[in-house]
């Protein structure tokens, strides 16, 4: 039994608060245990210079964390004058993941900006950002379809992400909080589609190694968790993506 009472294969309580911010075309507050991330999607009628005239759209992301989202205050990156390597990695990860489930030609020459702002962090902020960002993006795209800006939705599949890890005492664990992540011998972030295909795997042994059997167990655990997350996404989106039922 984990310190928070969960079973090894149990997700933290998760909720999606849609339309959390008024102004963006899509907005979601995702809460996973004590981790809370605001995910906003904004539509811009232009694309980066390298895509102009090509008829394709673009999806990109920015990620940040409030100074007191963590136990100790962290200095805002804007005050430092540069984005950290960790932030850059997470931003690119979110953008790559979302582009994997969107037909950019159907989106047309427009950009969807995803802003993920962590307001409280207790592990799994990047995976929560991806899961929430997909919902915000889907809502924004649904509005484009409903208003006739685009004819059909370019979203090709659902998308969610989760963390898994291996603890010396507890074994394989799903959806690690900060304490578990800090103590894990192995931790992984897994991104998958609704049809069960992998988008990205990030795995590291923390002063430890793991076997092929361990890897298979971690992937199976992640798949179970992601299926649950995607089912919850479907429930809250309702008729936004009817073609993906």
From Swiss-Prot:
InterPro entries: ExoRNase_PH_dom1, ExoRNase_PH_dom2, ExoRNase_PH_dom2_sf, PNPase/RNase_PH_dom_sf, Ribosomal_Su5_D2-typ_SF, RNase_PH, RNase_PH_bac-type, RNase_PH_CS
Membrane-crossing residue ranges in chain numbering: none
Alphabetical UniProt keywords: Nucleotidyltransferase, RNA-binding, rRNA processing, Transferase, tRNA processing, tRNA-binding
Entry-linked CDD domains: RNase_PH_bact (cd11362)
Gene3D superfamilies: GHMP Kinase, N-terminal domain (3.30.230.70)
Pfam families per record: RNase_PH (PF01138), RNase_PH_C (PF03725)
Enzyme type, top EC level: transferase
Binding, phosphate: 86, 124-126
Alphabetical list of SUPFAM superfamilies matching this protein: Ribonuclease PH domain 2-like, Ribosomal protein S5 domain 2-like
Known catalytic reactions: tRNA(n+1) + phosphate = tRNA(n) + a ribonucleoside 5'-diphosphate
GO BP field: rRNA catabolic process; rRNA processing; tRNA processing
Gene Ontology molecular function: any one: 3'-5'-RNA exonuclease activity
Keyword ATP-binding: no
Enzyme nomenclature, EC number: 2.7.7.56
Superkingdom as given in the UniProt entry: Bacteria
Self-association state and partner proteins as the record states: Homohexameric ring arranged as a trimer of dimers.
Family, per entry: Belongs to the RNase PH family.
Function according to Swiss-Prot or TrEMBL: Phosphorolytic 3'-5' exoribonuclease that plays an important role in tRNA 3'-end maturation. Removes nucleotide residues following the 3'-CCA terminus of tRNAs; can also add nucleotides to the ends of RNA molecules by using nucleoside diphosphates as substrates, but this may not be physiologically important. Probably plays a role in initiation of 16S rRNA degradation (leading to ribosome degradation) during starvation.
Protein name: Ribonuclease PH
Lineage: Bacteria, Bacillati, Bacillota, Bacilli, Bacillales
């Amino acid at each position: 039994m984990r310190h928070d009472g969960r079973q090894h294969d149990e997700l933290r309580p998760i909720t999606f608060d849609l339309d959390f911010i008024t102004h963006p075309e899509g907005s979601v507050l995702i809460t996973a245990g004590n981790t809370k991330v605001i995910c906003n999607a904004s539509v811009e009628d232009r694309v980066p210079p390298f895509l102009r005239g090509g008829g394709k759209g673009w999806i990109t992301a920015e990620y940040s964390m409030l100074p007191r989202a963590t136990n100790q205050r962290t200095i805002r990156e804007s005050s430092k004058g540069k984005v950290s390597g960790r932030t850059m990695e997470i931003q690119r990860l979110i953008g790559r993941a979302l582009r994997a489930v969107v037909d950019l030609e159907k989106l047309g020459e427009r950009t969807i900006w995803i802003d993920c702002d962590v307001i409280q962090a207790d592990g799994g902020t990047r995976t929560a950002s991806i899961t929430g960002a997909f919902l915000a993006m889907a809502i924004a795209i649904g509005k484009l379809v409903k208003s006739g800006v685009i004819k059909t939705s370019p979203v090709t599949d659902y998308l969610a992400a989760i963390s898994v890890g291996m603890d010396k005492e507890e074994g394989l664990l799903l959806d690690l909080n900060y304490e578990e992540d800090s103590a894990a011998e192995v931790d992984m972030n897994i991104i998958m589609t609704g049809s069960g295909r992998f988008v990205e795997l990030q795995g590291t042994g923390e002063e430890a190694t793991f076997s092929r059997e361990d890897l298979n167990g971690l992937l199976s655990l992640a798949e179970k968790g992601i299926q649950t997350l995607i089912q919850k996404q479907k429930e809250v989106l309702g008729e936004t993506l009817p073609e993906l039922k």
